[in-house]
Amino acid sequence: FVKKYALEGKAEIGMHLHAWNNPPMYQLEVAQEGAPYLIEYPDDVMEAKIKFLTNLIFERTGIKPVSHRAGRWATNEKYFELLSKYGYVVDCSVTPHVDWKTSLGQTEGSCGSDYSSAKDKPYSIDTSNGSSVLEVPVTILRSHKLFLKTSSAKNLARSIWHAMKGTELWIRPNGDNLEEMKYVLDQTYVSDRDYAMFMIHSSELMPGGSPTFKDERSIEKLYKDLEALFAYASVKYEGIRLRDLSNGKESSANKRTL
């Protein structure tokens, strides 16, 4: 299904790896209740998993992936070195303003990556093998703006609390954040950032595929929000693939890329 659009330049097939169910299987010592990050595995196992999934994507689609996002957002120097080795030129795993250290891994002391001080615009990551990977961070806005949730007193209180302490706004639907996503698009457009990045898991597009969208009613609401969001975005943004960003492709006049 996706291959047709990828070949037409309307979509992109990238690589996204969750280490615990990606061959070859390898048993880590279990010391914590979190799911294991790829960066917890020995270097040779990390490489074998990346090689396996990269080859599988090519075998199934005939397309060599060059873009990547890490499972559970975790990266390190070795990870980028291996991505470069297997032909990846662009990554989108960095989540500015977000610290994942409370998201535990499986081995003793393991946790997620801390991106709280990360750049929010594209930058090059040099690797030890002399090559580089373009990092295109996820669009996340730190904000104190109050978005009133009138559906219940509980939601109203939560909105006020988030505005007081500040919160991270993503272009990531949760069933109740259409206005927030539009706000991020608007703020990004008037900033010095030349793209906005939307994200969603494919499992979230079906009833019961995630804790966020548990039934058909919530999925219908999701699709209505997506239609409204992309209609709104299309006025000031145009779609682009990560591989095109890495090649320096520019957006049309007066438009940003999404």
Annotate the PLM regions:
Residues 159-258:
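C-terminal domain-boundary segment and adjacent tail
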Residues 70-191:
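Active-site-adjacent pocket scaffolds in enzyme catalytic domains
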Residues 1-7, 76-89, 253-258:
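Short, electropositive alpha-helical surface patch
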Residues 13-17, 66-68, 90-92, 134-136, ...:
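Hydrophobic faces of well-ordered beta-strands that scaffold small-molecule active sites
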Residues 1-70, 74, 131, 142, ...:
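Metal-dependent polysaccharide deacetylase catalytic core of the NodB/CE4 family, i.e.
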Residues 19-22, 72-75, 95-98, 140-143, ...:
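Short, solvent-exposed loop/turn segments at secondary-structure junctions
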Residues 24-25, 102-107, 147-149, 207-214:
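Histidine/acidic-residue-rich catalytic or RNA/ligand-binding cores of hydrolases
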Residues 34-45, 64-71, 109-110, 166-176, ...:
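The substrate-binding groove and active-site-proximal loops of carbohydrate-active enzymes
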